[in-house]
Amino acid sequence: MKYQQLENLEAGWKWTYLVKKWKEEEAITCHIDSSEAEAAIQSLLTIEHEPTKVIEWIDKHMSPALENKLKQAIRAKRKRHFNAEQVHTRKKSIDLDYRVWEKLAEKSQELGSTLSDTIEYLLSESNRTETVTKTVSDIRKDLSDLLD
């Protein structure tokens, strides 16, 4: 699925990504000399709110090893950004114990569906079971009232 590219917004994401990698002490520049690398990083830190300069900095100074990783990170960020605009594509996350996740994954494979679809199915089955149990209980009560 294609998503519209927003140059200014994505330049900000790229800047954030590069600074994060730099703080994690990864080599983000193509420079071998540490003084050149440090100067390039200092110039990156000063151009946060200047998208065109960020793009120029990337073209001139970024390590080739980071190129694919940056593209993948931006593609994922772009997808999350556009999916968050609509309720039905917005993703939510939940924390599950490993054993619960394992059982859910097993049930998903049995049903041949996604984890989300499996959760939805199990909830609807649970609701149906509650409804049937309540109906049976009501019938038993009515029957016992009639017999008394």
Swiss-Prot record:
The UniProt record lists the keyword DNA-binding: yes
CC terms in the record's Gene Ontology section: cytoplasm
Domain of life: Bacteria
InterPro entries documented for this protein: Arc_rbn_hlx_hlx, MatP, MatP_C, MatP_N, MatP_N_sf
Tagged with keyword Nucleotide-binding: no
Keyword vocabulary terms for this entry: Cell cycle, Cell division, Cytoplasm, DNA-binding
A molecular function GO annotation: sequence-specific DNA binding
Location(s) in or outside the cell: Cytoplasm
Stated family: Belongs to the MatP family.
Function of the protein: Required for spatial organization of the terminus region of the chromosome (Ter macrodomain) during the cell cycle. Prevents early segregation of duplicated Ter macrodomains during cell division. Binds specifically to matS, which is a 13 bp signature motif repeated within the Ter macrodomain.
Quaternary context: Homodimer.
Protein's recorded name: Macrodomain Ter protein
Organism annotation: Photobacterium profundum (strain SS9)
Upper taxonomic lineage: Bacteria, Pseudomonadati, Pseudomonadota, Gammaproteobacteria, Vibrionales
